[in-house]
């Protein structure tokens, strides 16, 4: 039977996917999700004290027999630094959406302060796991500190300068598109324009239906492209099953 921390992880993933697909939650649903997530704050006994600034203080993912849990856009993290931070950031993001005050504000402020003491969160480190961890920080900053344009831009520069340094998991680039779908508009639009042709190439492909991860990726690509004025018309479009091939597709063309 899943423990309480596993249930919190599942709730975080399902809620994020629902919102990415354009779903809307009622106030009672928001309140219930908030309560369940707040009940799963870690105890002092589960906190990691080695290099404490690198690891979450409020939420860490379940043990899962030592296997790192995937991020909401499927990446299988290779280290706890990436997995643990991604998990905490996503929960804090949901809490911020549903109850942006009081203890939630305190946790976000504490986390921002923690990140300023990390190489991957504040010092533009791009080596090993720090590149992916820095991406998780960028998504966190987009809601936690949208006014800090310099910090946001610094993390973007790390991505642009070092993404091509080596071969990366296919989900890394798509995670960046997820980040762009929620980033402050004035910073996001030039980056989306830079990524536009690559996103179009991917969104116009067909995908195997049984692969659920491809479904959420199509919505991420839709949401990102739709921020550009010339693609605003696709904002509410849904993926569909091609009658001939039986594969999942998305129509990004004009009406």
Residue map of PLM features:
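Preference for long, amphipathic alpha-helical scaffolds in soluble/luminal domains
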Residues: 1-255
């Amino acid at each position: 039977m899943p423990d309480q921390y596993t249930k919190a992880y599942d709730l975080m993933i399902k809620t994020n996917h629902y919102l990415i697909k354009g779903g809307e939650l009622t106030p009672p649903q928001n309140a219930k999700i908030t309560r369940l997530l707040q009940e799963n704050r870690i105890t002092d006994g589960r906190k990691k004290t080695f290099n404490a600034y690198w690891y979450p203080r409020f939420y860490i993912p379940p043990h899962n027999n030592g296997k790192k849990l995937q991020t909401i856009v499927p990446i299988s993290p290779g280290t706890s630094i990436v997995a643990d931070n991604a998990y905490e950031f996503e929960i804090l993001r949901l809490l911020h959406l549903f109850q942006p005050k009081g203890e939630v504000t305190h946790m976000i402020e504490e986390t921002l302060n923690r990140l300023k003491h990390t190489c991957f969160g504040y010092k533009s480190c791009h080596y090993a796991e720090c590149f992916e961890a820095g991406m998780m920080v960028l998504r966190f900053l987009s809601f936690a500190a949208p006014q800090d344009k310099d910090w946001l831009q610094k993390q973007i520069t790390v991505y642009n300068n070092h993404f091509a340094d080596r071969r990366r998991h296919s989900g890394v680039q798509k995670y960046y598109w997820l980040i762009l779908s929620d980033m402050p508009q004035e910073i996001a639009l030039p980056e989306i324009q830079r990524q536009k042709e690559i996103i179009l190439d991917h969104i116009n492909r067909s995908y195997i239906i049984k692969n659920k991860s491809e479904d959420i990726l199509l919505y991420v690509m839709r949401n990102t492209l739709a921020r550009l004025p010339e693609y605003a018309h696709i904002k509410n479009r849904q993926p569909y099953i091609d009658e001939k091939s039986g594969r999942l597709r998305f129509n990004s063309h004009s009406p």
